[in-house]
Amino acid sequence: RRALEDAQEDAEAAANIISGHTLRMEERKKKADAAAEARVKLTMDVGALDNRIRLLTEMEKDYEGFNKAVKLVCQAQNNLRGIHGPVASLMKTDGKYSLAIEIALGAGLQNIVVDREEDAKSAIAFLKQREGGRATFLPLTAIRGEELRERGVENEFGFVGVASRLVRFDPKYTQIFNSLLGKTVIAEDLDCGIAMARKYRNAFRIVTLDGQVINRGGSMTGGSTSRSAGVLSRAAELERLNGRASEMHRKLEEARAAEEASRRELDAAQYELTTAETQRRAAEDEVLRLQGV
């Protein structure tokens, strides 16, 4: 009789253990499912991000957005001497300034920097021969530029900066960017720009962060502008996405590791549950044997 009671206690204990393992299994399955869902979402996000980066990179590589002449010259760099590339590809700026700088440069974005006047002459002959259109060339040996000299302008309300100081470039291009942007002020908004223009008697050009322009002499140009249409906006987006991509890929690897760990925990819980069920069956069989069934 004592053996039967012991067997019944063993069967009951095994049933209790199974209940605990079943709860643990449910918890670990929820955790594993959540980890899998997080990994799938991150995989999709990373895929979309990588596709966007690939598209923008291809557009940069193919000089998408540049005119025919610029494309022809840049794609023939191996056959032409002294070609550095279009202004837009020789500089970087923060995303918050990209629209203003793009407007400030205008067609100058597509000007092609070359070593010498002779290199510009050869490139012009190349375009003429191929009926490839026209381009403007900026020889490093010829271009000279100056920065704004008006005193106190940097202290004006709404002054963001002289445009040439809001872009990053190799120091050898300093004269190029001074000539293109050295006498342009970037202002917070049109009200600030108008106040500055009045005070300094329209002595320099002002471009606002949202792309409105007050020209030297007082004429104004403005309206709506697409923030994603230009080559600088594209370059700024590409730089931002590349920075984000490394972080996203790191998170994806962490999500994969978390999913794998949760699956291992789930497998361990399944093994424990299976073992407990085997022990319960053995205990129940022993009870039946002792009962003489």
Question: Where on the chain are the PLM-derived regions?
Answer:
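Short linear sequence elements within intrinsically disordered, low-complexity coil regions
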Residues: K68-K71, E102, A276
